[in-house]
Protein backbone atom coordinates (compact mmCIF):
# COMPACT_ATOMS: atom_id res chain seq x y z
CA UNK A 1 0.00 0.00 0.00
CA UNK A 2 1.30 3.44 -0.94
CA UNK A 3 1.29 6.32 1.53
CA UNK A 4 0.71 8.87 -1.23
CA UNK A 5 -0.87 8.47 -4.68
CA UNK A 6 1.54 8.15 -7.61
CA UNK A 7 2.24 11.41 -9.41
CA UNK A 8 2.64 12.15 -13.12
CA UNK A 9 0.10 9.49 -14.07
CA UNK A 10 -0.86 10.13 -17.67
CA UNK A 11 -2.22 6.76 -18.78
CA UNK A 12 -4.11 4.13 -16.75
CA UNK A 13 -5.12 0.62 -17.82
CA UNK A 14 -8.01 -1.12 -16.04
CA UNK A 15 -8.28 -4.82 -16.87
CA UNK A 16 -11.93 -5.81 -16.45
CA UNK A 17 -12.62 -8.78 -18.69
CA UNK A 18 -15.87 -9.94 -17.08
CA UNK A 19 -19.47 -8.96 -17.82
CA UNK A 20 -21.59 -5.82 -17.94
CA UNK A 21 -22.53 -5.93 -14.25
CA UNK A 22 -18.85 -6.04 -13.31
CA UNK A 23 -18.14 -3.15 -15.65
CA UNK A 24 -20.91 -1.10 -14.07
CA UNK A 25 -19.40 -1.67 -10.63
CA UNK A 26 -15.90 -0.95 -11.98
CA UNK A 27 -17.14 2.38 -13.34
CA UNK A 28 -16.96 3.67 -9.76
CA UNK A 29 -13.23 2.92 -9.73
CA UNK A 30 -12.81 4.78 -13.02
CA UNK A 31 -14.78 7.74 -11.68
CA UNK A 32 -12.55 8.06 -8.61
CA UNK A 33 -9.41 7.77 -10.72
CA UNK A 34 -10.77 10.50 -13.00
CA UNK A 35 -11.26 12.76 -9.99
CA UNK A 36 -7.69 12.07 -8.82
CA UNK A 37 -6.09 12.28 -12.27
CA UNK A 38 -8.34 14.55 -14.38
CA UNK A 39 -5.88 14.72 -17.29
CA UNK A 40 -5.05 11.02 -17.44
CA UNK A 41 -6.23 8.71 -20.19
CA UNK A 42 -8.19 5.80 -18.69
CA UNK A 43 -8.22 2.71 -20.90
CA UNK A 44 -10.28 -0.42 -20.27
CA UNK A 45 -9.42 -3.90 -21.48
CA UNK A 46 -12.87 -5.45 -21.95
CA UNK A 47 -15.03 -7.69 -24.11
CA UNK A 48 -15.81 -6.13 -27.49
CA UNK A 49 -19.58 -6.08 -26.91
CA UNK A 50 -19.16 -3.56 -24.09
CA UNK A 51 -16.64 -1.19 -25.70
CA UNK A 52 -19.07 1.33 -27.18
CA UNK A 53 -21.02 1.56 -23.89
CA UNK A 54 -17.89 2.42 -21.90
CA UNK A 55 -16.76 5.02 -24.42
CA UNK A 56 -20.13 6.67 -24.97
CA UNK A 57 -20.77 7.16 -21.24
CA UNK A 58 -17.31 8.51 -20.50
CA UNK A 59 -16.34 5.59 -18.29
CA UNK A 60 -13.26 5.02 -20.46
CA UNK A 61 -11.18 7.37 -22.59
CA UNK A 62 -10.27 4.45 -24.81
CA UNK A 63 -10.86 0.71 -25.00
CA UNK A 64 -8.79 -2.24 -26.11
CA UNK A 65 -11.29 -4.98 -26.86
CA UNK A 66 -11.12 -8.74 -27.20
CA UNK A 67 -13.58 -11.39 -28.37
CA UNK A 68 -14.55 -13.82 -25.63
CA UNK A 69 -15.47 -16.48 -28.15
CA UNK A 70 -11.91 -16.43 -29.48
CA UNK A 71 -10.37 -16.54 -26.00
CA UNK A 72 -12.46 -19.68 -25.42
CA UNK A 73 -11.60 -21.15 -28.81
CA UNK A 74 -8.72 -23.29 -30.02
CA UNK A 75 -5.19 -22.71 -28.71
CA UNK A 76 -4.35 -20.98 -31.99
CA UNK A 77 -7.36 -18.66 -31.69
CA UNK A 78 -6.52 -17.84 -28.07
CA UNK A 79 -2.90 -17.18 -28.95
CA UNK A 80 -3.77 -14.85 -31.80
CA UNK A 81 -6.29 -12.92 -29.72
CA UNK A 82 -3.85 -12.56 -26.83
CA UNK A 83 -1.08 -11.42 -29.17
CA UNK A 84 -3.31 -8.77 -30.77
CA UNK A 85 -4.48 -7.61 -27.35
CA UNK A 86 -0.99 -7.22 -25.89
CA UNK A 87 0.34 -5.59 -29.04
CA UNK A 88 -2.39 -2.93 -28.91
CA UNK A 89 -1.82 -2.32 -25.20
CA UNK A 90 1.95 -1.99 -25.43
CA UNK A 91 1.58 0.78 -27.99
CA UNK A 92 -0.25 2.89 -25.42
CA UNK A 93 2.58 2.93 -22.82
CA UNK A 94 0.81 2.90 -19.47
CA UNK A 95 2.03 4.44 -16.22
CA UNK A 96 -0.43 2.43 -14.10
CA UNK A 97 -2.24 -0.89 -14.55
CA UNK A 98 -5.05 -2.14 -12.29
CA UNK A 99 -5.92 -5.81 -12.67
CA UNK A 100 -9.56 -6.23 -11.65
CA UNK A 101 -9.91 -9.44 -13.67
CA UNK A 102 -7.47 -11.23 -11.34
CA UNK A 103 -6.99 -14.18 -13.69
CA UNK A 104 -4.10 -16.14 -15.14
CA UNK A 105 -4.53 -14.39 -18.49
CA UNK A 106 -4.82 -10.91 -16.99
CA UNK A 107 -1.61 -11.46 -15.01
CA UNK A 108 0.16 -12.43 -18.24
CA UNK A 109 -1.10 -9.22 -19.85
CA UNK A 110 0.03 -7.10 -16.90
CA UNK A 111 3.49 -8.66 -17.03
CA UNK A 112 3.84 -8.02 -20.77
CA UNK A 113 2.50 -4.44 -20.61
CA UNK A 114 4.95 -3.78 -17.74
CA UNK A 115 3.74 -0.40 -16.46
CA UNK A 116 5.77 1.31 -13.75
CA UNK A 117 2.97 0.84 -11.18
CA UNK A 118 1.02 -2.44 -11.29
CA UNK A 119 -1.84 -3.07 -8.86
CA UNK A 120 -3.01 -6.62 -8.15
CA UNK A 121 -4.83 -8.53 -5.41
CA UNK A 122 -3.15 -10.21 -2.46
CA UNK A 123 -4.26 -12.88 -2.08
CA UNK A 124 -5.74 -13.47 -5.54
CA UNK A 125 -9.30 -14.79 -5.77
CA UNK A 126 -7.96 -18.21 -6.79
CA UNK A 127 -4.59 -19.47 -5.53
CA UNK A 128 -1.73 -19.05 -7.98
CA UNK A 129 -0.81 -22.25 -9.77
CA UNK A 130 2.61 -23.81 -9.90
CA UNK A 131 5.05 -21.60 -11.82
CA UNK A 132 2.55 -18.70 -11.81
CA UNK A 133 3.60 -15.41 -10.22
CA UNK A 134 1.93 -12.14 -9.29
CA UNK A 135 3.40 -9.35 -11.48
CA UNK A 136 1.92 -6.55 -9.35
CA UNK A 137 4.26 -4.32 -7.37
CA UNK A 138 1.41 -2.67 -5.43
CA UNK A 139 -0.71 -5.26 -3.63
CA UNK A 140 -4.31 -4.54 -2.70
CA UNK A 141 -6.63 -6.24 -0.24
CA UNK A 142 -9.46 -8.43 -1.58
CA UNK A 143 -11.96 -5.84 -0.29
CA UNK A 144 -11.13 -2.22 0.45
CA UNK A 145 -12.46 0.53 2.71
CA UNK A 146 -13.92 -1.97 5.16
CA UNK A 147 -16.66 -3.07 2.76
CA UNK A 148 -18.00 -6.56 2.06
CA UNK A 149 -19.90 -5.90 -1.18
CA UNK A 150 -18.07 -6.88 -4.38
CA UNK A 151 -18.06 -3.21 -5.32
CA UNK A 152 -15.39 -2.78 -2.64
CA UNK A 153 -13.23 -5.36 -4.36
CA UNK A 154 -13.21 -3.09 -7.40
CA UNK A 155 -12.63 0.00 -5.24
CA UNK A 156 -9.86 -1.61 -3.18
CA UNK A 157 -7.06 -0.53 -5.60
CA UNK A 158 -7.82 3.09 -4.68
CA UNK A 159 -6.94 2.37 -1.06
CA UNK A 160 -3.75 0.58 -2.08
CA UNK A 161 -2.74 3.59 -4.19
CA UNK A 162 -3.53 6.09 -1.44
CA UNK A 163 -6.37 7.59 -3.48
CA UNK A 164 -9.41 8.82 -1.56
CA UNK A 165 -12.91 7.45 -2.11
CA UNK A 166 -15.02 10.37 -3.35
CA UNK A 167 -17.57 8.54 -5.53
CA UNK A 168 -18.61 5.46 -3.50
CA UNK A 169 -21.26 3.98 -5.83
CA UNK A 170 -21.67 3.69 -9.60
CA UNK A 171 -23.80 6.35 -11.25
CA UNK A 172 -24.19 6.33 -15.03
CA UNK A 173 -26.20 9.08 -16.68
CA UNK A 174 -28.14 7.96 -19.77
CA UNK A 175 -27.15 9.82 -22.92
CA UNK A 176 -29.59 12.51 -24.18
CA UNK A 177 -29.95 10.81 -27.56
CA UNK A 178 -30.64 7.45 -25.92
CA UNK A 179 -33.15 9.04 -23.55
CA UNK A 180 -34.97 10.44 -26.58
CA UNK A 181 -34.99 6.96 -28.12
CA UNK A 182 -36.26 5.47 -24.87
CA UNK A 183 -39.10 7.99 -24.64
CA UNK A 184 -40.03 7.35 -28.27
CA UNK A 185 -40.12 3.60 -27.58
CA UNK A 186 -42.33 4.11 -24.54
CA UNK A 187 -44.64 6.33 -26.56
CA UNK A 188 -44.95 3.72 -29.32
CA UNK A 189 -46.04 1.14 -26.77
CA UNK A 190 -48.30 3.56 -24.85
CA UNK A 191 -46.16 3.39 -21.71
CA UNK A 192 -45.79 6.40 -19.44
CA UNK A 193 -42.47 7.30 -17.84
CA UNK A 194 -42.27 6.33 -14.17
CA UNK A 195 -45.47 4.31 -14.55
CA UNK A 196 -44.08 0.97 -15.67
CA UNK A 197 -41.93 -1.79 -14.19
CA UNK A 198 -38.95 -3.00 -16.22
CA UNK A 199 -38.69 -6.79 -15.93
CA UNK A 200 -35.57 -8.79 -16.75
CA UNK A 201 -36.05 -12.56 -16.64
CA UNK A 202 -32.64 -13.60 -17.95
CA UNK A 203 -29.32 -14.50 -16.34
CA UNK A 204 -26.05 -16.05 -17.47
CA UNK A 205 -27.01 -19.48 -16.06
CA UNK A 206 -30.44 -21.14 -16.25
CA UNK A 207 -30.35 -22.00 -12.57
CA UNK A 208 -30.22 -18.29 -11.70
CA UNK A 209 -33.36 -17.53 -13.73
CA UNK A 210 -36.57 -17.40 -11.75
CA UNK A 211 -39.21 -19.42 -13.56
CA UNK A 212 -41.05 -17.52 -16.35
CA UNK A 213 -44.36 -18.89 -15.06
CA UNK A 214 -43.70 -17.30 -11.67
CA UNK A 215 -42.74 -14.01 -13.29
CA UNK A 216 -46.09 -14.10 -15.08
CA UNK A 217 -48.00 -14.75 -11.85
CA UNK A 218 -46.12 -11.95 -10.08
CA UNK A 219 -46.79 -9.54 -12.94
CA UNK A 220 -50.51 -10.30 -12.84
CA UNK A 221 -50.76 -9.76 -9.08
CA UNK A 222 -48.69 -6.55 -9.11
CA UNK A 223 -50.73 -5.24 -12.03
CA UNK A 224 -53.96 -6.00 -10.17
CA UNK A 225 -52.81 -4.17 -7.05
CA UNK A 226 -51.01 -1.20 -8.62
CA UNK A 227 -52.23 -0.68 -12.18
CA UNK A 228 -48.65 -0.30 -13.38
CA UNK A 229 -47.57 -1.45 -16.83
CA UNK A 230 -44.75 -3.92 -17.57
CA UNK A 231 -41.88 -3.89 -20.04
CA UNK A 232 -39.73 -6.98 -20.62
CA UNK A 233 -36.07 -6.24 -21.39
CA UNK A 234 -33.04 -8.41 -22.06
CA UNK A 235 -30.62 -9.73 -24.64
CA UNK A 236 -31.27 -11.68 -27.86
CA UNK A 237 -30.58 -15.04 -26.20
CA UNK A 238 -33.32 -14.38 -23.62
CA UNK A 239 -36.24 -14.21 -26.05
CA UNK A 240 -37.59 -17.67 -25.20
CA UNK A 241 -38.10 -16.84 -21.51
CA UNK A 242 -39.73 -13.53 -22.41
CA UNK A 243 -42.14 -15.20 -24.82
CA UNK A 244 -43.16 -17.69 -22.12
CA UNK A 245 -43.92 -14.82 -19.75
CA UNK A 246 -46.03 -13.02 -22.34
CA UNK A 247 -47.90 -16.25 -23.10
CA UNK A 248 -48.61 -17.03 -19.43
CA UNK A 249 -49.43 -13.52 -18.15
CA UNK A 250 -53.05 -12.40 -18.20
CA UNK A 251 -51.95 -8.76 -17.98
CA UNK A 252 -50.62 -6.89 -21.03
CA UNK A 253 -46.81 -7.07 -21.18
CA UNK A 254 -44.67 -5.18 -23.69
CA UNK A 255 -41.75 -7.28 -24.91
CA UNK A 256 -38.62 -5.55 -26.29
CA UNK A 257 -36.18 -8.33 -25.39
CA UNK A 258 -33.31 -8.43 -27.87
CA UNK A 259 -34.27 -5.09 -29.44
CA UNK A 260 -32.21 -2.59 -27.40
CA UNK A 261 -28.55 -1.64 -27.31
CA UNK A 262 -26.95 -1.37 -23.87
CA UNK A 263 -27.06 2.43 -24.09
CA UNK A 264 -30.77 2.44 -24.92
CA UNK A 265 -31.45 -0.17 -22.24
CA UNK A 266 -29.82 2.09 -19.63
CA UNK A 267 -32.03 4.98 -20.75
CA UNK A 268 -35.17 2.82 -20.64
CA UNK A 269 -34.29 1.57 -17.15
CA UNK A 270 -33.83 5.18 -16.07
CA UNK A 271 -37.46 5.90 -17.01
CA UNK A 272 -38.90 2.94 -15.07
CA UNK A 273 -40.67 3.20 -11.74
CA UNK A 274 -38.94 0.01 -10.65
CA UNK A 275 -36.69 -2.76 -11.92
CA UNK A 276 -37.73 -6.36 -11.20
CA UNK A 277 -35.38 -9.11 -12.24
CA UNK A 278 -32.82 -11.78 -11.56
CA UNK A 279 -29.35 -11.13 -10.21
CA UNK A 280 -27.71 -9.92 -13.42
CA UNK A 281 -25.99 -7.09 -15.26
CA UNK A 282 -29.22 -5.19 -16.04
CA UNK A 283 -29.97 -5.14 -12.30
CA UNK A 284 -26.73 -3.22 -11.70
CA UNK A 285 -27.45 -1.00 -14.72
CA UNK A 286 -30.84 -0.06 -13.29
CA UNK A 287 -29.27 0.84 -9.95
CA UNK A 288 -26.58 2.92 -11.68
CA UNK A 289 -29.35 4.78 -13.54
CA UNK A 290 -31.02 5.59 -10.20
CA UNK A 291 -34.01 3.24 -10.48
CA UNK A 292 -35.22 1.29 -7.41
CA UNK A 293 -34.60 -2.45 -7.66
CA UNK A 294 -36.17 -5.71 -6.61
CA UNK A 295 -33.44 -8.25 -7.33
CA UNK A 296 -34.15 -11.98 -7.06
CA UNK A 297 -31.41 -14.01 -5.42
CA UNK A 298 -30.70 -17.65 -4.74
CA UNK A 299 -27.45 -18.95 -3.26
CA UNK A 300 -25.58 -15.75 -4.12
CA UNK A 301 -25.40 -13.44 -1.09
CA UNK A 302 -27.16 -10.11 -1.78
CA UNK A 303 -24.86 -8.47 0.76
CA UNK A 304 -22.02 -9.18 -1.68
CA UNK A 305 -23.72 -8.85 -5.07
CA UNK A 306 -26.93 -6.88 -4.46
CA UNK A 307 -27.83 -3.53 -6.05
CA UNK A 308 -26.11 -0.49 -4.56
CA UNK A 309 -26.94 3.18 -4.25
CA UNK A 310 -30.74 2.96 -4.64
CA UNK A 311 -33.78 1.75 -2.75
CA UNK A 312 -33.74 -2.02 -3.08
CA UNK A 313 -35.13 -5.29 -1.78
CA UNK A 314 -33.53 -8.65 -2.54
CA UNK A 315 -35.96 -11.50 -1.78
CA UNK A 316 -34.30 -14.85 -1.33
CA UNK A 317 -35.52 -18.34 -0.35
CA UNK A 318 -34.65 -19.69 3.06
CA UNK A 319 -31.18 -21.15 3.45
CA UNK A 320 -29.76 -23.76 3.58
CA UNK A 321 -31.53 -24.72 0.39
CA UNK A 322 -33.24 -28.08 -0.11
CA UNK A 323 -32.01 -28.83 -3.62
CA UNK A 324 -34.74 -29.14 -6.25
CA UNK A 325 -32.52 -29.49 -9.34
CA UNK A 326 -29.77 -31.97 -8.53
CA UNK A 327 -29.12 -32.70 -12.21
CA UNK A 328 -28.34 -29.02 -12.93
CA UNK A 329 -27.27 -27.46 -9.64
CA UNK A 330 -23.53 -27.16 -9.01
CA UNK A 331 -23.36 -26.03 -5.41
CA UNK A 332 -21.47 -24.57 -3.64
CA UNK A 333 -20.72 -22.33 -6.66
CA UNK A 334 -23.41 -19.62 -6.30
CA UNK A 335 -23.18 -18.75 -9.99
CA UNK A 336 -24.29 -22.30 -10.86
CA UNK A 337 -26.87 -23.00 -8.18
CA UNK A 338 -30.64 -23.17 -8.69
CA UNK A 339 -31.82 -21.95 -5.28
CA UNK A 340 -33.79 -19.01 -6.73
CA UNK A 341 -36.25 -21.55 -8.17
CA UNK A 342 -37.57 -21.99 -4.62
CA UNK A 343 -38.49 -18.31 -4.34
CA UNK A 344 -42.26 -17.94 -3.95
CA UNK A 345 -44.39 -15.51 -5.94
CA UNK A 346 -45.82 -13.88 -2.81
CA UNK A 347 -42.36 -12.93 -1.53
CA UNK A 348 -41.59 -11.18 -4.81
CA UNK A 349 -44.93 -9.39 -4.95
CA UNK A 350 -44.53 -8.25 -1.34
CA UNK A 351 -41.04 -6.92 -2.11
CA UNK A 352 -42.31 -4.91 -5.08
CA UNK A 353 -45.20 -3.47 -3.07
CA UNK A 354 -42.85 -2.57 -0.23
CA UNK A 355 -40.56 -0.62 -2.56
CA UNK A 356 -43.49 1.12 -4.24
CA UNK A 357 -44.96 2.14 -0.88
CA UNK A 358 -41.50 2.99 0.53
CA UNK A 359 -42.22 0.93 3.65
CA UNK A 360 -38.93 -0.89 3.44
CA UNK A 361 -36.88 -0.79 6.64
CA UNK A 362 -33.74 -2.15 5.01
CA UNK A 363 -33.78 -0.07 1.82
CA UNK A 364 -30.21 0.51 0.75
CA UNK A 365 -29.52 4.00 -0.57
CA UNK A 366 -25.74 3.81 -0.46
CA UNK A 367 -23.05 1.57 0.91
Could you describe each region identified by the protein language model?
Residues 1-367:
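Catalytic machinery of carbohydrate-active enzymes
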Amino acid sequence: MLQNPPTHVRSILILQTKFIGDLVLASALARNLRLQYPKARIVFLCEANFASFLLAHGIASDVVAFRRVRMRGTPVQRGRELYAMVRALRRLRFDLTIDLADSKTSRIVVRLVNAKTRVGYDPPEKPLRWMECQPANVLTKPFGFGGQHYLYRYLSPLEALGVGLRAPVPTIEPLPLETARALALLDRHHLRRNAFIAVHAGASFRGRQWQPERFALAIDEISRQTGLDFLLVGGPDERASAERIVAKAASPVVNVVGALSLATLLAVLGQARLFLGNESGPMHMAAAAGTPVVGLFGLTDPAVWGPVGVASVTPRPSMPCECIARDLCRRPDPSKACCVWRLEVKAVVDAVLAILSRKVKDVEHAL
